[in-house]
C-alpha cells in the first residue's frame, strides 16, 4: 500500500508539469520569451498561477524546461549520419527523420527556431559546443565520401544546412504552407510525399540518383 501511495504524488506531479510545459510551448510560440507571462501560461493550463510557481520558480525556469524538453526531442529525432551507411542511405535516413520530426512535433521546431532568431541567448553553450561538434563530425563523413568518389563534390556543411532548413520549413511555416494549399492541417500521406520529394531532389544534387 505504501508504494502505491508513493507513486500517486509522482504521477500527479508529472501530469501537472506536462500540462504546464504544453501550455508554455503555446505561449512562447505566440508571444515569444519576452511577451509570455506566467499568468497566461497558468490560465492556458487551467491551473492557478501559484501551482505553476510551485513547480517552476519563475518564467525563466519554465522556458529553460521547455527548451530542454525541445532539445531532447530534437536530439532523439534528428537521426544520424553513419559512415557505414554510405551517402545514399545516410541522406535518406536523415531526411526521413527530420521530416517525421517536423510533421509530428511542429511546436518543438518552432520553439527552437524562435530561440535562434532571438539571438540564442539561452542556447549559446549548446550552439557553440554540441551543435558545432555534431555538424563538423558529420561534414567530415560527407567529405570522406566525396574524397572516395562516392558522391558529387558539394559543400558538406551547407548540405547539412539545406537538409535542416528544407525539412524544418514544414513545421516553422506550417500556417503559410497550409494556407497556400487551402488546408486546415497536414494529411497522413504528406510525410511520405514530402520525404520522397526532398530525398529525390537532394540525392540528385549529390549525384546519387540515376
Language-model regions, residue ranges each:
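Helix-turn-helix
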Residues: 19, 23, 27-61, 65
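Amphipathic alpha-helical segments used for helix-helix packing
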Residues: 103-125, 174-182
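Hydrophobic alpha-helical connector segments
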Residues: 79-108, 148, 156-163, 192
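Amphipathic alpha-helical linker/stalk segments
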Residues: 66-93, 138-144
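Short acidic/histidine-centered micro-motifs embedded in hydrophobic/aromatic stretches
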Residues: 111-115, 129, 162, 166
Amino acid at each position: 500500500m505504501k508504494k502505491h501511495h508513493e507513486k500517486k504524488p509522482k504521477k500527479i506531479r508529472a501530469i501537472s508539469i506536462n500540462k504546464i510545459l504544453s501550455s508554455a510551448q503555446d505561449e512562447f510560440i505566440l508571444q515569444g520569451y519576452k511577451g509570455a507571462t506566467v499568468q497566461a501560461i497558468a490560465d492556458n493550463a487551467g491551473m492557478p498561477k501559484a501551482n505553476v510557481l510551485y513547480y517552476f520558480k519563475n518564467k525563466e525556469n519554465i522556458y529553460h524546461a521547455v527548451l530542454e524538453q525541445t532539445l531532447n526531442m530534437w536530439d532523439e529525432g534528428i537521426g544520424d549520419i553513419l559512415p557505414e551507411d554510405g551517402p545514399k542511405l545516410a541522406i535518406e535516413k536523415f531526411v526521413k527523420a527530420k521530416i517525421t520530426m517536423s510533421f509530428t512535433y511542429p511546436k518543438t521546431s518552432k520553439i527552437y527556431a524562435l530561440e535562434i532568431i532571438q539571438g540564442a541567448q539561452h542556447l549559446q553553450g549548446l550552439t557553440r559546443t554540441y551543435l558545432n561538434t555534431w555538424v563538423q563530425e558529420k561534414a567530415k563523413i560527407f567529405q570522406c565520401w566525396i574524397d572516395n568518389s562516392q558522391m558529387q563534390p558539394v559543400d558538406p556543411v551547407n548540405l547539412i544546412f539545406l537538409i535542416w532548413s528544407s525539412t524544418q520549413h514544414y513545421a516553422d511555416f506550417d500556417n503559410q504552407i497550409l494556407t497556400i494549399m487551402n488546408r486546415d492541417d497536414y494529411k497522413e500521406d504528406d510525410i511520405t510525399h514530402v520525404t520522397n520529394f526532398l530525398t529525390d531532389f537532394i540525392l540528385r544534387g549529390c549525384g546519387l540518383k540515376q
